Amino acid sequence: MDKTMRGYRQIPVWLKYLINAVLLCALLVLGNHIVTSGAVNRAQKAVILQIGIYILLAVSLNVATGYLGQLPLGHAGFMAVGAYAAALLWKTLPKTTWAVILGLLLGGLVAAAFGVIIGVPALRLKGDYLAIITLGFGEIIRVLIINLPGITGGTPGLMSIPKHSTFLTVYITVILSCALIHTLMKSRHGRAILAIRENEIAAEASGVNTTFYKVLAFSVSAFFAGVAGALYAGYTGILTPSNFTFMTSINILVMVVLGGLGSMAGSIIAAGILTALPLMLQSFSKYRMVIYAVLLIVTMIFKPSGLLGRYDFSLSRILEKLINGRLFTRKAGKAGEDHA
């Protein structure tokens, strides 16, 4: 029975990755068919795309907040930088797949550069001081957008942005981004980042370059926020400073805290729920924000560590339980027949 129970674990690693890839591709094809076949209305389609964008924003902030243990409040600033960088590039390029990829990469790289510039001095501080500095950064970016109308369009906004953010573009980007972050956190670099979260002094005493890894985590967080910003630009087709206020950063932080600090799966679930909830409550238009707030308060009272805490699940774990459970049932049944 021991050999049977090992079922899924005996499958080669490359085959596990292949199974996961096939399942994800099937989900992408199914989702794209639902969106493009008219099975959902325009509002529902918009929410589906927003969910993907906010998943990436929540997962990216989780790198700095959940894995590193810091409290940045300027995530909307990195999102804005990436959004405007990609939008300006897309307005000058023809509509091609390479243009989309270049825009996403440019948005991420520009945001990561700002992450390094802000991270080097800011990450010497902790707690409230870091929150204040990053909050100031987000507001500076918003003010610059307003006061550079020749580049950003100013208060009226940057318009006529090509709408590149289709269902497949958004969710392929989200899946690849989550896979890259997951791979990073399973590497020795990820373990160093987690060590800093648990005890920075002990990590430094163990030989971990805390300054380097704090800036690394911060810049990775900023990079994927910039990519999400680029997706947002390609989704809306217009960017205004009001899209990137302090409340945007707070909303993203709420998703991370609600899902569970340090849980990628929690961030994904919370982002999906909080993005879809306003649409689900539209029948209660007068009270939907009150209901939204009450649900958040009740959840945090009864689940203060978030929906999943620090627990993460994966396709591999789910498949392992399903396969092992099925094999165990068959083995037990066969043993019963033999005994009879």
Where are the language model's segments positioned?
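Alpha-helical transmembrane segments within multi-pass membrane transporters and channels
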Residues: 93-139, 269-271
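Residue-level recognition of pore/gate-forming positions within transmembrane alpha-helices
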Residues: 54, 83-84, 111, 135-140, ...
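Helix-loop-helix "hairpin" substructures at the membrane interface of multi-pass membrane proteins
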Residues: 166-240
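Single transmembrane alpha-helix segments in multi-pass membrane proteins
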Residues: 41-93, 117-130, 200-204, 209-210, ...
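Membrane-interfacial amphipathic/re-entrant helices at transmembrane-helix boundaries
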Residues: 1-56, 85, 96-103, 339-340
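Transmembrane alpha-helical segments in multi-pass inner-membrane proteins
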Residues: 76, 215-302
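Transmembrane helix-bundle core of multi-pass membrane transporters
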Residues: 132-189, 324-332, 339
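Cytosolic-side transmembrane-helix boundaries in multi-pass membrane proteins
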Residues: 1-29, 198-200, 205-215, 281-340
